[in-house]
Amino acid sequence: MNRDTIFSTPIEKLGDFTFDESVADVFPDMIQRSIPGYSNIITAIGMLAERFVTEGSNVYDLGCSRGASILAIRRNAPTKNFRIIGVDNSRPMVERCRSHLSAYHSDIPVNIVCDDIRNIEIQNASMVVLNFTLQFLPRTDRIALLTKIYHGLNPNGILILSEKFSFVDNTIDELLVDLHHTFKRANGYSELEVSQKRTALENVMLTDSIQTHKNRLQDAGFSQIELWFQCFNFGSMVAIKQSP
């Protein structure tokens, strides 16, 4: 696993964070050292796949990066007769995802698409994963995507939405941000790395509160919604499409 040193030296002109070649190269290390509980979320996605993936359906991983969720789904699904569609708009991520998945034999068909997730039609879906992806879309585009997902899910289908959260109470928000930075330092990131990455992300990663996410999911059509995991200001929610 290549170690993330992207922000380890001072960068004179610090642009917005992008999922470019350098990020794709170190992404597994970056995400493990940056997102508390990431491994737990991936493990649970596999557990949810075991319960929700159905025969003959489609499973979508929107913002699939290097394919960690897809591997968990493939390993745990109760049937091999379904299809996985992984989507990412980063060409370097897509190339590495395809290469990574090809190292593990499976009879389950997987199609990795390089495209904007907003362009993807969701059909016959038993499961949709949005793992730390929605936060990179403009807020005005989020409800349309979630509504499309809701309509594309089969009855009893599940959406897994993992995000970094913000909090209305400033004291709580600052505490959880500080704990997250402590977590990153404990994982070997320097103050410079933490600071520069935060600056690079501030215009492209737009976080919402847990209640805002719940309200938006309700507006999209979901009625069964719950936060199932949280560590500091990161977490994951499930939303299930009820049977008629």
Swiss-Prot record:
NCBIfam families: carboxy-S-adenosyl-L-methionine synthase CmoA, PRK15451.1. One of its GO terms (molecular function) is carboxyl- or carbamoyltransferase activity. It catalyses: prephenate + S-adenosyl-L-methionine = carboxy-S-adenosyl-L-methionine + 3-phenylpyruvate + H2O. GO terms for biological process: tRNA wobble uridine modification. Its EC number is 2.1.3.-. InterPro entries: CmoA, Methyltransf_25, SAM-dependent_MTases_sf. This is Carboxy-S-adenosyl-L-methionine synthase. Keywords: S-adenosyl-L-methionine, Transferase. Homodimer. CDD domains: AdoMet_MTases. Catalyzes the conversion of S-adenosyl-L-methionine (SAM) to carboxy-S-adenosyl-L-methionine (Cx-SAM). S-adenosyl-L-methionine binds at residues 38, 63-65, 88-89, 116-117, 131, 198. It comes from the Bacteria. It is an enzyme of class 2 (transferase). Belongs to the class I-like SAM-binding methyltransferase superfamily. Cx-SAM synthase family.
